[in-house]
A protein has these predicted regions:
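Carbohydrate-active catalytic/glycan-binding domains of CAZyme proteins
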Residues: 1-130
Length: 130
């Protein structure tokens, strides 16, 4: 994207296996071999999602039911299922994304308000670019 390489990865929000939400993160680099930036937040409940661009140029990420379903309104409030939790009620959800070069770097974010911010249980602190 632009002149940068973007590496996507996933992790549980509590940095513990199947605890919290399974999220999508990313890092950027000038060369494919790195060094890469610190981990940045890309989307909540998008873990193991596939990021792709459609024929019209819109970016998307697949999201899956991965854990106990909690309604998005409840998950945003910080409801703790005590185990893996997800707001994806169906087997597959397509979430619109924004991926763009900004000031020599890349900004990735989910456009759906339910997916765009880390939850209250997120162990890592992020500065979110809106």
């Amino acid at each position: 994207v632009g002149n940068k390489y973007v590496l996507f990865g996933t992790a549980w929000s509590r940095d513990s296996l199947r605890k919290g939400t399974y999220n999508l993160y990313y890092a950027t680099a000038d060369k494919i071999e790195g060094p890469y930036s610190d981990r940045r937040f890309a989307g909540r409940c998008l873990g193991h999602g596939t990021v792709f661009r459609d024929k019209k140029g819109q970016w998307w990420c697949t999201a899956f039911l991965n854990g106990k379903y909690i309604a998005p309104e409840e998950l945003v409030k910080g409801v703790d299922a005590g185990t893996a939790s997800s707001m994806n009620q169906q087997g597959l959800t397509l979430v619109p994304m924004s991926i763009e070069a900004v000031n020599g770097d890349v900004v990735v974010r989910a456009l759906d308000p339910h997916y765009c911010l880390p939850g209250t249980e997120e162990m890592q602190q992020f500065t979110i670019t809106q």
